[in-house]
Design a protein with these regions (language model features):
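Bacterial N-terminal signal peptides
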Residues: 5-16
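N-terminal hydrophobic/helix-forming segments and targeting peptides
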Residues: 17-360
């Protein structure tokens, strides 16, 4: 290599590394509207539409029969798949009582007590109807427990009144939510799990140069992860043995909070993306984990390694013999009405997805 070529290479590589990382404003501009879109498991349409609107113009997105949004780019082997899920925890109406209250069933795993006596929204498909999640009986005998079945009140007073409002069995409920900036680079809201993963995939795809790819990469925004990884399972079965490696892009439930002990899942916010080496559903092969760490170090992507609870979409590819290497970011207070994220970790996650797609 000539001195001039070497000099050009030394200049271009740092500039490219810098260009790969989205700005904090880029992160906010994608994440905030996704957070403020509603999509309980099975009703992800509004979130899928929001993602579609933010994809780069060259991306050709398709929706499969399950409702997964899919973008395929590049050709040849190995085939690498990234999966972030569209859905959020919430409730579905299972029955409407004569007194007009709505009986609810959970979609996803969370503590019901977090939602007692809080504002509610019923999503009818046409509009969102305000209501209230019922509290436990304040005059009942001790110990007072969460109501069974859990219910919501929209103020109707009768089943006929609920019907007149256009509310039906099968409609979903959530708590109202918004993206709220906190001090520094942190933010709070509900459904960062997994709108951060969705955001990181969008930001990576925007920076991806299809001409640089030497193989095929598929980006999936999956449905119904919170109720059994159902959308990802459809993708895994459709691709079968063709997939070489899958990367679930999802939350790392961190113990980095004022409340929790630090003996497990202690991955600090603001210190970068996370290689989710071990969770309840999958184990990253050690050789692949080591290779990922070396790649991140070489490309100067902040990366932590940890083990946590929960499962991930990539695990359903295991029945096809596909290794799952989950990519994550640390989150406080997961599956609560007020999760907390550091936007610098979202930057790092988007950058990590990009370098993995291009160079691994």
């Amino acid at each position: 290599m000539t001195r001039l070529a070497l000099l050009v290479t030394m200049i271009v590589l740092p500039m490219r590394a810098l260009a790969q990382q989205p700005s904090l404003d880029d992160v906010r501009s994608v994440l905030a509207p996704l957070i403020e879109s509603y999509g309980v498991s099975g009703m992800e349409g509004p979130v899928r539409d929001a993602v579609s609107r933010m994809l780069p113009a060259w991306a050709r997105a398709t929706t499969d029969t399950a409702g997964n949004l899919i973008v395929s780019v590049g050709e040849g082997e190995p085939l690498v798949v990234f999966v972030a899920h569209l859905d959020e925890i919430g409730f579905v109406i299972s029955a409407i009582r004569e007194d007009g209250t709505l009986e609810l069933k959970q979609r996803g795993g969370f503590f019901l007590s977090l939602f007692e006596a809080q504002p509610a929204l019923v999503h009818t498909g046409e509009r969102s109807v305000p209501g209230v999640f019922l509290p436990r009986d304040s005059v009942g005998t001790s110990p007072r427990r969460t109501p069974v079945p859990f219910r919501a009140d929209v103020g109707a007073g009768s089943r006929a009144g609920v019907d007149a409002m256009g509310i039906r069995v099968g409609h979903t409920l959530t708590m109202p939510k918004q993206f709220v900036p906190l001090a520094g680079t942190r933010a709070t809201g509900r459904s960062f799990d997994d709108r951060v993963g969705c955001t990181a995939q969008i930001l990576a795809l925007r920076r991806l140069d299809p001409k640089r790819l030497k193989h095929r990469v598929i980006f999936v925004w999956s449905v119904r992860e919170e109720i059994g990884l159902e959308g990802a399972r459809v993708v895994a079965d459709a691709l079968g043995l063709a997939t070489s490696r899958v990367h679930a892009v999802d939350t790392f439930v961190s113990s980095d909070s004022p409340l929790e002990i630090k003996t497990f899942a202690d991955v600090p916010l603001g210190s970068g993306a996370v290689a989710r080496a071990l969770d309840n559903s999958s184990v990253t092969p050690p050789a692949l984990a080591d290779s990922l760490v070396r790649l991140a170090a070489r490309r100067k992507v902040p990366l932590q390694v940890g083990s946590t609870n929960g499962g991930n979409d990539g695990s359903v590819f295991g029945s096809w013999g596909v290794p799952d290497v989950p990519l994550a970011w640390p989150l406080r207070y997961a599956h609560s009405p007020a999760e907390v994220v550091d936007l610098r970790d979202v930057q790092a996650l988007a950058q990590l997805i990009l370098v993995v797609a291009e160079d691994w």
